[in-house]
């Protein structure tokens, strides 16, 4: 479905979002790895392989503008961290498959993943403010 939407809409930017309840801060994910956890997802599905894409690259770096992310979040005083592991679960799989598709299809779309923390640890208004400003900055730069 995501591939179909990408092909139809031809976005310049894709920001993937997911929740990481163990995180205390919003996190910019730098890389997705070609690895799956063997634990069940919310629907009960358990992968039969440890690879997301059998002959895919071991890792694929986000192409979202991190420097702009850092500048924007510092300007808005939104706390964040730079993360070098999107995990081995659903969020990482989504990030990996999306980046892999964009690369294979020779698309120039900027793409990355941002993990949202437990909202008891960082306020929703702080997160929304930072993300809004970042999205506006990305639009201005494209």
Predicted features and spans:
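N-terminal catalytic or cofactor-binding beta/alpha core of small enzyme domains
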Residues: 1-86, 99-108, 129-142
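A short secondary-structure junction signal
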Residues: 27, 94-95, 125-126
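Polyanion-binding loop/helix "lid" in catalytic or ligand-binding cores
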Residues: 87-91
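Short, hydrophobic/amphipathic alpha-helical patches that form generic packing surfaces
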Residues: 92, 96-100
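A structured phosphate/pyrophosphate-recognition subdomain
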Residues: 113-125
